[in-house]
């Protein structure tokens, strides 16, 4: 079967060959080769493959050494199909909070580790050094080597081949989990405290009994090791709209938010005008849960049923005093098996909530999809902002009060108390070209270009964007970045 794009290319070739046929004689082989080149160029233009053509030096009107355009960040060597890891490393280099986290871990471990940091924390040490190198802005082109990070990462992610094409989002998760494993194993409680005294309660609160002020400080130190800048918390709540009761509330940590785009009818292309906010609403939207048994609704219906049939007051009182939990045996003990009951009595809704925002928000746009024959890639642009406001997705904004149910210490609540805790700034965009399971990754990353005197001012006017494809680096505009068909988006909390 010939693909749709293959058919279009063939059609372009046929049109052009018809126009240059002279006296029923074909043009030379050289001309025909040129013809194929023209056809390929036209095809690429029609499918938007050259939308960033102006970024190439061949088509750029910029002078290499003119003004600030001479400033560049280092590229990364491709050591064999590891572009998926290179874009993650470049992305992390633009995440100030992540670099600071690694530096804090190394500084905190300096006094407690018996050996050298490079031996005890090899991945943390290698990654921190590489990210510092990638954050250096210079006037000359330079290329860094990710080999040390790859070697140390392989020791933790043994089943993840770093020299064959992989998914960039999966590489990020392997890197984060490997760092956590290394940091937690090398953690040493200070003085006489014991890790066994630090307990985890069911509501995710960590407790340090009988430790006093020292125990609280140790708890904060352990908590800082445990939670990285990518750690957020998702809440999942089940609510019955019939009886207005909250059936369950569960929490789980997340490192990335997997968002599905809005699709055209048929599900092969992303809907025109789709935005990141649309994807977030879809992810957090309420959904009806079928075939779910609401015990509170059932007990209410059972009370009415017993009253109608004239049951004994003792049975009614027993039913009324029942808590309606999962271990309830009212149905058998009160002979209510014959009571008419169906899910029509209950209207159960499931709602996801971002209960705690991470310092660094990584959004994964799920472009891989399946039909009954094959896996394919969802093409199309999703509009994303330079500044993202997540305050619209807090529990209070959607009418669900969960604050009273999350008993966490005030130290954990402080980051959420800020009125700007839901505001994020875009720092990196990862883009994938080609089909699922193959192709090539590139990255757009933001860098602040300033002098030493201006470093503390942290002005948005000094923010520059670079397009990076392994070792190739060029400066681009914000419009180029916003036009990317993003696979991963990295946002930093303001």
From Swiss-Prot:
Organism encoding this protein: Arabidopsis thaliana
A GO CC term assigned to this protein in UniProt: membrane
Gene of this entry: UBP27
Family matches, as Pfam families: UCH
Domain USP: 74-494
Function: Recognizes and hydrolyzes the peptide bond at the C-terminal Gly of ubiquitin. Involved in the processing of poly-ubiquitin precursors as well as that of ubiquitinated proteins.
Residue intervals passing through the bilayer: 30-50
PROSITE patterns: USP_1, USP_3
Protein known as: Ubiquitin carboxyl-terminal hydrolase 27
GO BP: protein deubiquitination; proteolysis
Family annotation (PANTHER family): UBIQUITIN CARBOXYL-TERMINAL HYDROLASE (PTHR24006), UBIQUITIN CARBOXYL-TERMINAL HYDROLASE 30 (PTHR24006:SF888)
Compartmental location: Membrane
Main location: membrane
Membrane topology summary: Single-pass membrane protein
Active site: 83 (nucleophile), 440 (proton acceptor)
Assigned EC number: 3.4.19.12
Keyword tags: Hydrolase, Membrane, Protease, Thiol protease, Transmembrane, Transmembrane helix, Ubl conjugation pathway
InterPro entries: Papain-like_cys_pep_sf, Peptidase_C19, Peptidase_C19_UCH, USP_CS, USP_dom
Catalytic function, reaction form: Thiol-dependent hydrolysis of ester, thioester, amide, peptide and isopeptide bonds formed by the C-terminal Gly of ubiquitin (a 76-residue protein attached to proteins as an intracellular targeting signal)
Phylogenetic placement of the source organism: Eukaryota, Viridiplantae, Streptophyta, Embryophyta, Tracheophyta
Similarity annotation: Belongs to the peptidase C19 family.
GO molecular function, one term: cysteine-type deubiquitinase activity
């Amino acid at each position: 079967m010939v693909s749709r794009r293959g058919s279009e290319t063939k059609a372009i070739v046929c049109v052009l060959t018809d126009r240059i046929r002279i006296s029923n004689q074909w043009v030379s082989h050289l001309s025909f080769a040129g013809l194929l080149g023209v056809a390929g160029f036209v095809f690429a233009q029609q499918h938007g493959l050259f939308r960033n053509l102006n970024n190439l030096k061949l088509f750029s009107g910029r002078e290499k050494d003119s003004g600030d355009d001479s400033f560049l960040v280092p590229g990364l060597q491709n050591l064999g199909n590891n572009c998926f890891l290179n874009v993650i490393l470049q992305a992390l280099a633009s995440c100030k909070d992540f670099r600071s986290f690694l530096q804090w871990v190394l500084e905190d471990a300096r006094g407690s580790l018996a050996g050298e940091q490079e031996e005890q924390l090899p991945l943390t040490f290698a990654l921190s050094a590489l990210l510092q190198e990638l954050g250096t802005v210079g006037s000359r082109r330079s290329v860094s080597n990710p080999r040390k990070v790859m070697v140390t990462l392989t020791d933790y992610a043994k089943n993840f081949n770093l020299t064959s094409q992989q998914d960039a989002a999966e590489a990020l998760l392997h890197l984060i989990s490997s760092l956590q494993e290394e940091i937690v194993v090398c953690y040493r409680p200070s003085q006489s405290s014991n890790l066994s005294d630090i307990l985890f309660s069911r509501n995710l609160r960590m407790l340090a009994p009988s430790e006093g002020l020292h125990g609280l400080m140790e708890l904060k130190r352990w908590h800082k090791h445990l939670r990285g800048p990518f750690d957020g918390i998702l809440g999942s709540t089940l609510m019955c709209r019939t009886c207005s009761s909250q059936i369950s509330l569960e929490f789980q940590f997340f490192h990335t938010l997997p968002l599905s785009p809005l699709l055209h009818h048929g599900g092969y292309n992303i809907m025109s005008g789709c935005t990141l906010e649309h994807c977030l609403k879809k992810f957090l939207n309420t959904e009806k849960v079928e075939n779910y048994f609401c015990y509170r609704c059932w007990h209410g219906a059972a009370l009415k049923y017993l009253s109608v049939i004239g049951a004994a007051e003792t049975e009614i009182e027993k039913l009324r005093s029942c808590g309606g939990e999962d271990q309830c045996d009212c149905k058998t003990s009160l002979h209510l098996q014959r009571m008419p009951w169906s899910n029509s009595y209950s209207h159960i809704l499931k709602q996801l909530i971002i209960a705690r925002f991470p310092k660094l928000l990584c959004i994964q746009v799920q472009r891989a999809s399946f039909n009954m024959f094959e896996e394919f890639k969802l093409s199309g642009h999703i509009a994303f902002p330079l500044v993202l406001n997540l305050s619209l997705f807090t529990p209070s904004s959607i009418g669900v009060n969960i604050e009273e149910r999350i008993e966490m210490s005030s130290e954990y609540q402080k980051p959420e108390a800020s009125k700007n805790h839901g505001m994020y700034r875009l720092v990196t965009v990862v883009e994938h070209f080609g089909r699922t399971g193959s192709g090539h990754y590139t990255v757009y990353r933001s860098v602040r270009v300033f002098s030493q005197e201006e470093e503390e001012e942290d002005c948005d006017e000094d923010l520059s964007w670079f397009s990076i494809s392994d070792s190739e680096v060029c400066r681009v505009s914000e419009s180029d970045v916003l036009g990317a068909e993003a696979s991963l988006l990295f946002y930093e909390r303001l």
